[in-house]
Design a protein with these regions (language model features):
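Conserved alpha/beta-domain cores
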Residues: 1-108
Length: 108
């Protein structure tokens, strides 16, 4: 689906909270299911990579918004995936910026 949408869009902004919820079929509003809501799940990360690849093939950029964008444990992974932009709250900019500056993208 991302390949078809990329032909019509100027960019993709991946909402990771909703993506996680729908990919894993877990209602994030239900506290009984909290243990199943895993934004680091391989299926979620694979979906992000697939969207980024389709965006780039169509010549558009793909960014991350939602909680995962500010997750420093995934910043290098997102760089490796080719994510073009991370949308983060002001308090998370400096830690994310440091990781990006300290990462040699050519080694990923």
């Amino acid at each position: 689906m991302a390949d078809a949408l990329a032909k019509e869009a100027d960019f993709f902004s991946i909402g990771t909270n909703d993506l996680t919820q729908y990919t894993l079929a877990v209602d994030r509003q239900n506290p009984k299911l909290d243990t199943f809501f895993d934004a680091h799940h391989p299926a979620v990360l694979k979906m992000i990579k697939m969207v980024v690849d389709n965006a780039h093939r169509a010549g558009i950029w793909a960014g991350i918004c939602g909680e995962l964008g500010a997750d420093t444990s995934l910043t290098q992974k997102f760089l490796e995936m080719g994510v073009d932009e991370l949308s983060v709250s002001p308090g998370r900019i400096l830690p994310i910026r440091k990781i990006i500056r300290d990462t040699d993208v050519s080694e990923l």
